[in-house]
Amino acid sequence: CIRDREESCLVGTLGLWQGVDVPGPSCSLVIIDRIPFPRPDDPLMSARLDFINEHGGNGFMSVSASHAALLLAQGTGRLLRSSTDRGVIAVMDSRLVTARYGSYLRKSLPPYWETTNTEVVLNSLRRITGSLH
């Protein structure tokens, strides 16, 4: 079981974001490769987006960005399962910082400090895990 092995590595897709509970030191790093926007060919999301746009709203922010914010919060929740859990969440999608909607998405995350410095991240992981395998 992954919970019993601190040196293990679990790789998963978006479907793994729900129902996974690995509290404690076995989970110290969660990597999110891209912002989890809904698929553009999802008919339900497209209908919601079109409806809001047709009624003068911003469908992208109301539907797509809101959905992505919820999923980002869920994804980061894989790391922080208790008040004593510590770790690094690495979001590899630069749009989280560069896009106009990035600040909206960042507000969905738990309290954190932000860095793009690899050494800062590695040092944090060393402190958390006691080493870096």
Identify the meaning behind each predicted range:
Residues 3-133:
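ASCE RecA-like P-loop NTPase motor cores
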